[in-house]
Design a protein with these regions (language model features):
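Catalytic cores and adjacent flexible loops of soluble metabolic enzymes
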Residues: 1-273
Length: 273
């Protein structure tokens, strides 16, 4: 699977201020992949409350997209279930990505999992939104999710953030507990501290069907120039601090944009939140 980007509402987000992959219009995806005559399936992310899904997510038979990943917080579960059922009825594979579980109550997570379990979603994702979780925590979380998955016939996925340099460690820990869909990005590119690095994960999997050479070539030809052009992502002290405190990285993103280096003052500000 490869995710193109978001299916965001053009009523809520200005098309002139965001790139085309914030909206993933069908014609823009087809301009890249045509009819996608390959074995690779394509997915998009749809955030609860930020997507006009009834209008913007068209029937699967008219789309080159295969999967819709519904991203939700635990308190939005009823709306998430509506989105899941809508996408499933349109013919898509569907996952439910429950975000910010490190900030949620155990009872709320359990209730959310039961709701997704009873839905028609194909899979459920563990999401370490703030990059604050450690491998031993992922172990118990993965066991909870996989047990639920076995009960309801759902596969489990893992989406990690690299605030504490643990995205790779947490991803392979999840894999060792039976989690089967592992999110990764080239050179760990992603919001803030980034995600699990694809090149790391492929090296770990040691499966002969995976060829590292095209990946390295892709990094050379595309990712290095992107970095050199000024695109910023990856582990940095501000992201470590928000991850350590289990906070959203927005403050760290702003800190980095301002090119600040007063880490101690920044940490004090975070502690006061």
């Amino acid at each position: 699977y490869m995710e193109f980007g978001y299916k965001a509402s053009k009523e809520l987000f200005d098309v002139n201020k965001f790139g085309k992959w914030k909206f993933c219009d069908e014609e823009n995806i087809r301009a890249i992949v045509g009819d996608n005559n390959s074995d690779m399936k394509l997915s998009v992310m749809a955030d609860v409350g930020r997507c006009d899904y009834k209008k913007d997510i068209i029937d699967r038979k008219d789309s080159v997209i295969d999967m819709v990943r519904v991203a939700t917080y635990v308190h939005q579960m009823p709306a998430a279930i509506e989105m899941i059922e809508d996408a499933k009825a349109k013919g898509y594979e569907v996952t439910c990505n429950i975000m910010a579980i490190s900030n949620a109550k155990e009872t709320d997570i359990d209730q959310a999992l039961e709701m997704v379990g009873k839905s028609s979603a194909d899979g459920i994702y563990i999401v370490d939104s703030y990059g604050s979780l450690y491998p031993e925590q992922i172990r118990s979380i993965a066991d909870k999710y996989t047990e639920l998955g076995e009960k309801y016939g759902k596969y489990i996925g893992m989406h990690a953030h690299n605030n504490q340099q643990l995205a790779f460690a947490n991803t392979i820990e999840a894999a060792s507990r039976g989690v089967s869909l592992l999110d990764a990005t080239m050179m760990s590119m992603g919001r803030g501290a980034g995600n699990c690095a694809m090149e790391l994960l492929l090296s770990f999997l040691k499966n002969p069907k995976y060829n590292i050479f095209p990946v390295l070539k892709f990094l050379e030809d595309y990712m290095l120039p992107l970095k050199e052009s000024g695109a910023v992502w990856g582990y940095d002290i501000p992201y470590l601090l928000t991850g350590r405190l289990n906070q959203h990285p927005s403050a760290a993103i702003d800190f980095s944009k301002e090119k600040r280096s007063d880490y101690a003052d920044f940490y004090t500000d975070l502690l006061d939140k």
